[in-house]
Amino acid sequence: MKLGIVGLPNVGKSTLFNAITNAGAESANYPFCTIEPNVGVVAVPDARLDKLAEMYKPDKKTPAVIEFVDIAGLVKGASKGAGLGNKFLENIRRTDAIVHVVRCFDDENIMHVVADASQNEPVDPLGDIGTIDLELIMADLEMVNRRIEKATKAAKGDKKFLREAEVFEALAAHLDAGKSARTFACDDEERAIVETADLLSLKPIIYAANMDEAGFADYTHNAYFQGVRELAEQEGAQVLPICAKLEQDIAELDDPEERAMFLQDLGIEKSGLDRLIQCSYDLLGLISFLTYGKDECRAWTIKKGTKAPQAAGKIHSDIERGFIRAETINFDEMMACGGSVAAAKEKGLLRSEGKEYVVKDGDMIYFRFNV
């Protein structure tokens, strides 16, 4: 999974990226300090995997990972090439979802840049969201118009392309009204057509509402955050309250116990990174299954609804091709049997599942196959 972290200059985007990846990307109070996208790979915390590693003491423990990409700052007019716009838009196109960092704090020492890098403008989270949305929408409109032209020409020789042209014409009108592709009302057939266009404003989005420490401590009463949350609810997006500077402080603590105590002192149950990962999984409809043994204990990420052979294919295409069965027990069931697969097997909880089995979150699976 690849998440693109975007935002206008000076909203805390690179600070957040530095914190969640410990990558040390340059963070400065001027536009475009992130010109090439910085990439960081982050392990997905999973207590189930930790427990299996404790039980089996494998040669290798491999968590699922998320790739975060810190994408260059954007200004108004990017879809026409302003700022670093073209590079920004292409980098977004390569991601699975967008984490849009939105400034929800006041600080006269940090410029708020929208259109002019030399102009300090008032903090306006909803306006910032609108600025980036508009650039994505304009880039999408250009793409959709090309698809209309292509489908119209193709329809002269094959009438099946008429439907494609109709759908894209309706979408073009929607985009032209300043609305994102995410909010385009369509049925499953139309959705399948729309998804072939690889549209930027169709990508799932998480709004990371970045606050200072004072604002984050009582974020439910932060007026900026309230506005972002209401917008997210309207468009079916996720919103995550976060303090990037605080996350940076947490990331600098190497000792897990120190981190836990620091979070406890702040009255925070989970770090922003953990909450962002959970948010990403929920947004994209992802789950994890586990493989286990003396050689390796590993977590694998799949889409909800994935059947056993396709889950096996995440490990190796040969296992999918020669799939026979999946010997399965859910982690929670195994723990209810004293943390013993053997005890669970004696109770008949170890199941032999076939090709139609839909893998569940936390399933521990041993795949039988023959090629």
Question: Which positions does each model-derived feature cover?
Answer:
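Conserved G1/Walker A P-loop phosphate-binding module
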Residues: M1-N120, L126, D133, V144-N145, ...
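C-terminal-of-GTPase-core extension/linker across diverse P-loop GTPases
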Residues: K2-V6, V11, F17, N145, ...
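Long, contiguous hydrophobic alpha-helical segments, chiefly transmembrane helices and signal peptides
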Residues: L89, T95-I98, V102, L136, ...
